[in-house]
Amino acid sequence: MTQSLPPKNIVFYADDDLDDLELVKDAFAQYAKDVEVLTATDGSKALSYLSNLKKYDTIPCLIILDVNMPVIDGKETLLRLREMEHFQEVPVVLFTTSSQPIDKNFAQRYNAGFITKPIDVKQMEFIADKFIDHCADDIRNRIRRQMQ
């Protein structure tokens, strides 16, 4: 019997700011070696990638969206994700420079987290820690379903 490695935790992050993309990738790389951060630079590319995942592909256990992106912004991306069956329950965090109540309310209405930029590596590590446990639970549940 061949024993396979456990699936890697996937975090998907869409942001047009390359510095922010690197900050998030670095924080997850330092904090959790079993997390792979996949990225896109706008909502359209994010939706294209996510909608093309096949049945047996690893679904991200966390999606982080910048609110102010070109082509399709983070809010519209969130709305479209919530319409997709595989992503209705996946945790999403809106990551933005805005601290406006209307943006926070939007995130709450669509069951998403809300984090205001700028943040530093220490804050990002805290955020990574907060969501890694969820990713681990998600992976365990997927393995159980596959074994049934």
Regions found by a protein language model. Give the residues of each.
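Receiver (REC) domain active-site loop signature in two-component systems and cognate sites
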Residues: M69
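A Lys-centered signature of the CheY-like receiver
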Residues: K117-P118
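Active-site residues of response regulator receiver
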Residues: D15, C61, L65-D66
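CheY-like receiver
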Residues: D133-Q148
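Conserved acidic segment of CheY-like receiver
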Residues: K8-F28
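Acidic, metal-coordinating helix/loop segments flanking the phosphotransfer/catalytic sites
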Residues: T39-L62
